[in-house]
Design a protein with these regions (language model features):
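Trp/Phe/Arg-rich N-terminal binding region typifying the photolyase-homology
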Residues: 1-153
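Glycine/tryptophan-enriched, flexible segments
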Residues: 117-119, 138-241
């Protein structure tokens, strides 16, 4: 029996609540990312995005050492069914994805699949985003409490990660290698931290005078958007380093 951690737009180990909770369980933990054909063909995305994802996964794998994420090009339900032929899935852990309609409908289908197969799916809020709020009267209070709460640490040495070598025989595991492009920001937590540190230490000094200048603002702004969007960094982790 195993548990699964399903990476979505939360490609990090640090300050990752569902991963933190999954790490407390006794079962082996399979780390997985699905590169879905429906999303590949969706006009919201391009190869730039998927290369960023690959680089983010590679960055995590480097931190994990001998273990790695099972990186697949398939539909999540299809993947879970195939994994179930080899292992009994007890629970799936993930963040609630705040994406597009396609991912929302996919998650509804995954929930139905889990319910019909007695799989517990534990979803956690990402960056204190609340689904279905009727008003935001108490939201700011909760947000302040969230960002001031302790950043969750992961002890990688104690992560009971399932070795994917057996699953590699029944899946075509994707390669994370990408061509380097000096004009694009590379994905991964380690790269996000480099941009954050350079902003806090140097580039922020010209932020106010350059923010409205198209050329100068490229270097004086934080450049953290992709790292927050794809979850290489959590908003709480960033704010903890800024000490606001």
């Amino acid at each position: 029996m195993i548990n699964i951690y399903w990476f979505k737009r939360d490609l990090r180990l640090e300050d990752n609540e569902p991963l933190h909770e999954a790490s407390k369980q006794s079962e082996k933990l399979l780390l997985i990312y699905f590169l879905e054909d429906k999303l590949i063909s969706d006009p919201h995305y391009s190869n730039f995005h998927w290369n960023f994802v690959k680089q983010s996964i590679e960055d995590i794998n480097l931190s994990l050492g001998k273990k790695s994420i099972l990186f697949l090009n398939c539909d999540p339900i299809e993947g879970f069914k195939k994994i179930s032929e080899k292992y009994k899935i007890k629970s799936i852990y993930s963040h609630m994805e705040t994406g597009i309609e396609l991912t929302y409908l996919r998650d509804i289908d995954v929930k139905k699949y889990c319910d019909s197969n007695s799989i517990h799916w534990f979803e956690y809020e990402k960056n204190y985003v609340k689904r279905g709020l009727k008003n935001r009267k108490s939201w700011i209070k909760g947000w302040n409490e969230y960002v001031k709460s302790p950043v969750l640490k992961i002890d990688i040495k104690n992560l009971n990660i399932l070795d994917i070598k057996h699953l590699s025989k029944i899946f075509n595991v994707l390669d994370t290698r990408t061509n380097k492009n000096k004009h694009l920001q590379p994905g991964g937590t380690s790269n996000g931290l480099k941009y954050l540190r350079s902003f806090l230490e140097v580039r922020n000094k010209s932020y106010n005078q350059n923010i409205s200048k198209p050329l100068e603002s490229r270097s004086s702004c934080s450049r953290l958007s992709p790292y927050l969007s794809w979850g290489n960094l959590s908003s709480r982790y960033v704010l903890s380093l800024i000490h606001i």
